[in-house]
A protein has these predicted regions:
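Short, electropositive alpha-helical surface patch
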Residues: 69-82
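A general structural motif
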Residues: 15, 55, 75-77, 120-121
């Protein structure tokens, strides 16, 4: 269980791991234009189902493509943060929860489809960018999970946290408190 998740999202980690991935673009015709090494929907599904299991939560950070592949993922919870190519009506029966995003799931983690810039106090986990750009020049910490960028492998949120990805992320509450203290001292 990931205790730092905000209450509405804690059930995602009650019975298993939380895995995230973006931009699968299952069966979309123009994938090879984004990346000449793009693999097929079937190959992606094989990777995903080999990692995400029945008690896990699978969070798709948008641009799903053909929804028929989502039904093959055996996760307990399937969550979608809609991407710029997604329509809610196409996926309403395939995902347990749908969000238009961006979505703060803890005081230090923002999930979204597109990168959100200017928030220096949180980790933004997103997709949308099919390049392997690591820095967006905005002082923010980003993790790009576009499928072709992360090897088509869903990433475990618990493992990221355990490996220290949040170690240099202060969180909104700490920054807000520090700013309030500075204002009080000045005034």
């Amino acid at each position: 269980m990931i205790q730092s998740l905000y209450e509405p999202f804690r059930h995602w980690s009650e019975t298993g791991s939380i895995y995230m991935l973006a931009d699968t673009h299952f069966d979309d015709a123009d994938c090879k234009l984004m990346d000449p090494e793009w693999i097929t929907a079937e190959e992606q599904l094989e990777i995903i189902t080999g990692m995400v299991h029945r008690n896990d939560t699978f969070i798709h950070l948008g641009d799903v493509g053909n929804g028929k592949y989502i039904a093959e993922i055996r996760a307990k919870n399937k969550i979608l943060v809609l991407g710029n190519h997604d329509r809610r009506s196409d996926y309403a029966g395939l995902f347990d929860e749908l969000y238009t995003g961006p979505l703060f799931i803890s005081d230090r983690i923002l999930i979204s489809h597109e990168p959100v810039c200017g928030l220096t106090w949180c980790l933004n986990i997103h997709g949308h960018d099919h390049s392997r750009q690591e820095a967006y020049g905005d002082g923010c910490k980003h993790l790009n999970l576009a499928a072709n960028v992360c090897g088509y492998r869903p990433v475990s949120l618990g493992r990221l946290i355990k490996n220290g990805i949040l170690s240099d992320v202060d969180g909104i509450h700490r920054e807000t408190i520090d700013k309030a203290k500075k204002i009080k001292k000045i005034g």
